[in-house]
Swiss-Prot record:
This is Large ribosomal subunit protein uL14c. Pfam families: Ribosomal_L14 (PF00238). Belongs to the universal ribosomal protein uL14 family. One of its GO terms (biological process) is translation. SMART domains: Ribosomal_L14 (SM01374). It comes from the Eukaryota. Binds to 23S rRNA. It is found in: Plastid, Chloroplast. It comes from Gracilaria tenuistipitata var. liui. GO terms for molecular function: large ribosomal subunit rRNA binding; structural constituent of ribosome. One of its GO terms (cellular component) is chloroplast. Keywords: Chloroplast, Plastid, Ribonucleoprotein, Ribosomal protein, RNA-binding, rRNA-binding.
Amino acid sequence: MIQIQSYLNIADNSGARKIMCIQVLGSNNPHYANIGDIIIGVVKDALPNMPIKKSDIIRAVIVRTKKTIRRNDGMSIRFDDNAAVIINQENNPRGTRVFGPIAKELRDKNFSKIISLAAEVV
């Protein structure tokens, strides 16, 4: 579960490394975000000479959380870190690669472009 002021790693090659959540957009609960929810964040750490700079306000979709997710088939899954992928206004990723495993719940929320870029879908 991600809330306001939570730090997330970035799982793509857009240039940002860490973001801080400042607002939860796509969630039933306005205080917490889970996998597949859209957040607004501010870049706290970025690579030099990249299009995304430190202190930029960006939109991102959450792809991994430390909080255990319970699936309908009884399986529970959790990841080692909280991570997000930076997206544009059309919900397409701004980067061209996605690193690390991605939860398959993103497919249900129509983020198929992120799923296709991911090397591993769990």
